UniProtKB/Swiss-Prot annotation:
Family affiliation: Belongs to the conotoxin O1 superfamily.
Positions of disulphide bridges: C43-C57, C50-C61, C56-C68
Any one GO CC term of the record: extracellular region
Subcellular location per the Swiss-Prot or TrEMBL entry: Secreted
Domain notes: The presence of a 'disulfide through disulfide knot' structurally defines this protein as a knottin.
Keywords for this protein: Disulfide bond, Knottin, Secreted, Signal, Toxin
Protein name as annotated: Conotoxin Eb6.21
Organism the protein comes from: Conus ebraeus (Hebrew cone)
Length: 69
C-alpha cells in the first residue's frame, strides 16, 4: 500500500510540473537561446588580427605577424 501511495504522489508531481511549465515555454526557450549565444564562439577569419590561436577560426595565429592563417 505504501508503494502505491508513493507512486501516486510521484505521478501527481510530474503531472503538475508538466502543466505548470507549458505556460512558461516562451520564456524558457528565450533563456536557452541567450545561453546558447554566450556559448557560441566568435572567431577571426584568415588574415584578421589575432593574439592567440583560439581567436582564429582555423585555430592558427601567426605570432610573427599577429594574423590568423
Amino acid at each position: 500500500v505504501l508503494i502505491i501511495a508513493v507512486l501516486f504522489l510521484t505521478a501527481c508531481q510530474l503531472t503538475t510540473a508538466e502543466t505548470y511549465s507549458r505556460g512558461r515555454q516562451k520564456h524558457r526557450a528565450r533563456r536557452s537561446t541567450d545561453k546558447n549565444s554566450k556559448w557560441t564562439r566568435e572567431c577571426t577569419r584568415s588574415g584578421g588580427a589575432c593574439y592567440s590561436h583560439n581567436q582564429c577560426c582555423d585555430d592558427f595565429c601567426s605570432t610573427a605577424t599577429s594574423t590568423c592563417i
